[in-house]
Amino acid sequence: MSHIIVTGGAGFIGSRIIKELNSRGCRNILLVDDLSDATKINNIKDLDIEDFIPKDKFMEIFMVLADNDLVESVYHMGAESSTTCTDGNYLMSNNYQYTCNIANTCILHNIPLVYASSASVYGDSDVFDDSSTNYIPNNMYAYSKLLADKY
């Protein structure tokens, strides 16, 4: 059976994607997240998923599933979203490089990928301009998301 993967599935957006998929009858969902924050139970307790994959084990499992044509699609919502995180190395590894690895695997295996960016890549402007010349990331989180967007 083919799987729908939702990274960041215990977060606000990811859990709502799973809820919508459930409402459409989808149960073949693999929820990927870091559950070190136990309060995330409030987002996932009512969801119907096939299995949970810890974030730190995901890439290895994902490549095996993809190699065996067992992935229907990926919703990549997972990221360190704290705009106050000051560990640039962690943000680049977790948000940028992790996203690139997922994207490369999806491209290699023709797996549809839905990726969530962030409005923070445009900075604190009063006017929205989504042109590629108006990027003003004002913290490391925004910069890591911007690089992933450009990838």
Enumerate the language-model features and the residues they cover:
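NAD(P)H-binding glycine-rich loop region in Rossmannoid oxidoreductase-like domains
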Residues: 55, 60-94, 105
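Catalytic helix-loop patch of NAD(P)-dependent Rossmann-fold dehydrogenases
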Residues: 93, 97-101, 108, 112, ...
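Conserved catalytic-core motifs of eukaryotic protein kinase domains, centered on the activation segment
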Residues: 42, 83-91, 124-128
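Active-site loop signature of alpha/beta-hydrolase-fold enzymes
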Residues: 37-38, 80-83, 121-123
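SDR active-site strand-loop-helix element
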Residues: 7, 32, 74-78, 113-119
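Glycine/Thr-rich phosphate-binding loops of Rossmann-like dinucleotide-binding domains
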Residues: 14, 62, 84, 123-124
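N-terminal Rossmann/SDR dinucleotide-binding element
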Residues: 2-73
